[in-house]
Regions:
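Amphipathic alpha-helical segments used for helix-helix packing
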Residues: 33-55
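Amphipathic C-terminal alpha-helical segment
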Residues: 29-33, 77, 97-115, 127-133
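Hydrophobic alpha-helical segments that form the core
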Residues: 37-43, 86-107, 120-127
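Hydrophobic alpha-helical connector segments
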Residues: 5-38, 90-97
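Amphipathic alpha-helical packing segments from all-alpha helical-bundle domains
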Residues: 17, 21, 36-37, 53-80, ...
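Residue-level recognition of alpha-helical structural elements
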Residues: 15, 37, 56, 86-90, ...
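Structural signal for well-ordered, non-membrane alpha-helices
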Residues: 2, 6, 20, 27, ...
C-alpha cells in the first residue's frame, strides 16, 4: 500500500480529512529532496504502453485501483454519515479526486513546488464542501 494513502482506510478520520490528508501527504512526498520526481505508480505506466507488457504494469494498475477504491470508500462513508449529499454522483467525485492525485506526480516532475500543489489542494477541497450537507 502506498504510504500517503493509508488514511483512506482509517475510519477514525472524517472522510474529507482522510482525502485531504492523503492528497497533501502525496504532494509533500512528491516534492521531498531525494525522492524521485513523479510517482512511479502513475508515471510507470508510460514505460509499459503495449498489451504485451501488461504483466509488468499489473502491480501499478492494482495500486491505482486500490487508491481509487480508498477515495471511493471515503466518499461513500461521507454520504452514509450525512456529511455529503445523498444524491451526489459518488463515482464522478471519486474520479475528480483520483485524477487530481494522479496529476500530482506530473506536476512534481514538471517542477511545481509543494506550496503550489498545497494551494491547489485547498482549492480542490472546496469542491467537497460544495457537496456538503
Amino acid at each position: 500500500m502506498f504510504p500517503a494513502t493509508v488514511q483512506f482506510w482509517d475510519t477514525s478520520l472524517e472522510p474529507k480529512q482522510a482525502v485531504e490528508l492523503a492528497l497533501r501527504r502525496s504532494a509533500r512526498m512528491q516534492c521531498e529532496r531525494g525522492h524521485p520526481k513523479g510517482r512511479m505508480v502513475t508515471l510507470g505506466v508510460m514505460s509499459t504502453p503495449s498489451p504485451e507488457f501488461s504483466a509488468l504494469s499489473a502491480p501499478l494498475t492494482r495500486s491505482r485501483a486500490h487508491t481509487r477504491a480508498g477515495i471511493r470508500a471515503c466518499v461513500d462513508r461521507a454520504i452514509a454519515n450525512g456529511s455529503l449529499a445523498a444524491g451526489l454522483d459518488a463515482a464522478a467525485l471519486t474520479c475528480v479526486f483520483d485524477s487530481f492525485m494522479l496529476g500530482l506526480s506530473t506536476l512534481a516532475r514538471d517542477g511545481k513546488t509543494f506550496k503550489a500543489m498545497d494551494a491547489a489542494i485547498t482549492q480542490l477541497m472546496h469542491l467537497w464542501d460544495m457537496h456538503a450537507r
